[in-house]
UniProtKB/Swiss-Prot annotation:
This is Tyrosine--tRNA ligase. It is an enzyme of class 6 (ligase). A motif ('KMSKS' region) lies at residues 250-254. Belongs to the class-I aminoacyl-tRNA synthetase family. TyrS type 1 subfamily. The gene is tyrS. It comes from the Bacteria.
Amino acid sequence: MSDSPSRQQQLLRAQSNDPSFDNVWDELIWRGLVYVSTDEAALKQLLAGEPIAYYCGFDPTAPSLHLGNLVQLLTMRRLQLAGHRPFGLVGGSTGLIGDPKPSAERTLNAKETVAEWVGSLREQVTRFLSAEGDNAVRLVNNLDWTAPLSAIDFLREIGKHFRVGAMLKKDAVAARLNSDEGISYTEFSYQILQGLDYLELYRQHGCVLQTGGSDQWGNLTSGTELIRRVEGGHAHAVGTPLITNSDGTKFGKSEGNAVWLDPALTSPYAMYQFWLNTDDADVIARLKVFTFLHRDEIERLERAVAEEPFRREAQRRLALDVTSLVHGAAAAEAVIAASEALFGRGGDLAQQDTDTLASALRELPHTVSAPGVAIAQALVDTGLTKSLSEARRAVAQGGVSANNATVQDADAPVGDALLPGGMLVLRRGKKTLAGVFVEEGV
């Protein structure tokens, strides 16, 4: 249930930078989005002047972008709101190689797979950046300039400008060299390809700023150095911090899995719940990075966290805003309505969007049953009770509900009162929920 293109454009038009800051650079600093950069004074002056062209790259090493990429997309959008023109680079060539991981060699994906993922990422990038006005986003693919290059031309025209000693000092390369696995020439050459990207965008479109994660700093500066050597030009780079949770756990993971921007991989319901579960110690920092709320509103929410943390107002606002950004306002509204109905806080389960409710139940303990299976058995199958005898006692004590109605008969078939889509919501006590998907022939 994503928004239509017109509604998505309305959402983009409603976004704005905080007018309490004189310069977008100051706002980026306040939001905690600058970890490392080239000359800060020069960057601040550059961003306060005439519009510039800038870019960020996204490699198609998976079928979808994830929350780490969202940091870059929203940073790009803030610069666009300040009048600067974004170029979204989807790495059709660099995605065939993959940047070196500190631990092990990447598995190379098939060219056909990478080409398919390029299309998926292009669509995702365009959701977050405006295609209207003089500074409309433009998408580029680095395969367009690397594919025509012969190996000899690549080595003569680009490779000769890179010093091996400097390349060996890059963090990921150094880590791999000190490991048992080592590093292949394929991955070692990645930083040259990314440097070439910046050079081409500098030549073709006048790009003078590249943004990316701070873990990519060596690759970012390979481009600024290449531009200096080849063109005698001056270009900049900004590295955003790698976000971690206050308890030291890795940000952007849910049950050990990445939180993806594609609803087929991470449902809007799962996205909403991920943000709703943000710790009090982290929520204000997340609001700064992942929403367009202005400083006065974030400071108000910070006071609310300190004075009335049990209300979780900041978490609810964070979950609403990010889910709306990623999946659209309609999907966010459907998720909230389904959550309220699921947990008995209002709303009729039968009136909820079927796909949203199904995705919510898949996040809970659930089972697939035939229509004739007894509710008592479904309680055991979903883990709400450990045995049939415990299930019968729970029903006899009035402690079990199905679709928010108290269950009177433990032997009643699950197929007797289904929601649209063949679903049953079981509840034991006030808060323990499970789902049953009823199918013929199971």
